[in-house]
Amino acid sequence: MSEVITVKQTNMENIYECEFNDGSFRLCTRNLVSGFNVYGERLIKYEGVEYREWNAFRSKLAGAILKGLKTNPIRKGTKVLYLGAASGTTISHVSDIIELNGKAYGVEFSPRVVRELLLVAQRRPNIFPLLADARFPQSYKSVVENVDVLYVDIAQPDQTDIAIYNARFFLKVNGYMLLVIKARSIDVTKDPKEIYKAEVEKLENSNFETIQIINLDPYDKDHAIVLSRYKG
C-alpha cells in the first residue's frame, strides 16, 4: 500500500490534500474521532495528526471539489441541513470540517439506513440524525434551527422543489445551497444538460443566485451539483 509523504491544506478550510509515494493525490479531512473510520476509508497518520481519506467516488461533495468547486460554504462552525444523509459517508466528512462548534442535521427517510447513520452520530456529537421525509420540513421544524448551508442529495423527480421548500423553512438569507441534480431520477429520456438547465431555472425563479454548476462525471454519471446563494 502506498504511503503518505505530505499533507497540505487546500484553499478550503479543514480540507486537505494527501500526497502519496506513488505520486497520487487524494482529498482528506482531519478525523474528528481519532481511530475510527466510517465507510472503510483509509486512516492516515501524518505528523501526529490523523486524517481520513475522502473518496470522490463515494461522496459527491468530494467529487465536486476535485472537479473545481470554487468555494466550499461548509466551514468550521457552519450549521448544515443535509437532506438525504444516507448512512453517513459525506456527512461524516462534513462533521470533520465543521468541528464541534458546528452542527449537521441529517435527514434520511429509510429507517434501515438511519440506523447506520445513528451509529456514526454516536461518536460524532455534531451530527443530528432525523428519520423524516424531506417533502415535509414542518415535521422537523421544531428541532432544526436556521442553517448557513442546505445540502441536498435525494433521488426524487421533484428534488429541486423539495430543496426550495426546505430553504424557505431553514436557510438563512444569503445562505448557500449545494444541490445534487440526479438527471436520471428526474427524466430518463432527456439529455442531462437540458435537465440541469431546467432545474437551475427553477432555482433562479425562487430567489437563488447561481454561483457554479459542476458536472460530476466521472465520479457520478449524469449528475451535477449546483452551488447557489439564497436571496430570501
UniProtKB/Swiss-Prot annotation:
Q: Name one GO molecular function term.
A: rRNA methyltransferase activity
- Annotated TM spans: none
Which residues are recorded as binding S-adenosyl-L-methionine?
T89, T90, E108, F109, D133, A134, D153, I154, A155, Q156
Q: Which UniProt keywords apply?
A: Methyltransferase, RNA-binding, rRNA processing, Transferase, tRNA processing
What InterPro entries does the database record attribute to this sequence?
Fibrillarin (IPR000692), Fibrillarin_CS (IPR020813), SAM-dependent_MTases_sf (IPR029063)
Q: What class of enzyme is it?
A: transferase
Residue ranges annotated as coiled coil are none
Provide the E.C. number(s) assigned to this enzyme.
2.1.1.-
CDD domains assigned to the protein according to its UniProt record, in alphabetical order:
AdoMet_MTases
PROSITE patterns on file: FIBRILLARIN
Among the Pfam families in the record, one is: Fibrillarin
**GO biological process: one example:** tRNA processing
Task: Please state which protein family the record places this protein in.
Answer: Belongs to the methyltransferase superfamily. Fibrillarin family.
What PANTHER family is this protein classified in? FIBRILLARIN (PTHR10335:SF17), RRNA 2-O-METHYLTRANSFERASE FIBRILLARIN (PTHR10335)
Q: What does the protein in this record do?
A: Involved in pre-rRNA and tRNA processing. Utilizes the methyl donor S-adenosyl-L-methionine to catalyze the site-specific 2'-hydroxyl methylation of ribose moieties in rRNA and tRNA. Site specificity is provided by a guide RNA that base pairs with the substrate. Methylation occurs at a characteristic distance from the sequence involved in base pairing with the guide RNA.
Quaternary form? Interacts with nop5. Component of box C/D small ribonucleoprotein (sRNP) particles that contain rpl7ae, FlpA and nop5, plus a guide RNA.
Q: What is this protein called?
A: Fibrillarin-like rRNA/tRNA 2'-O-methyltransferase
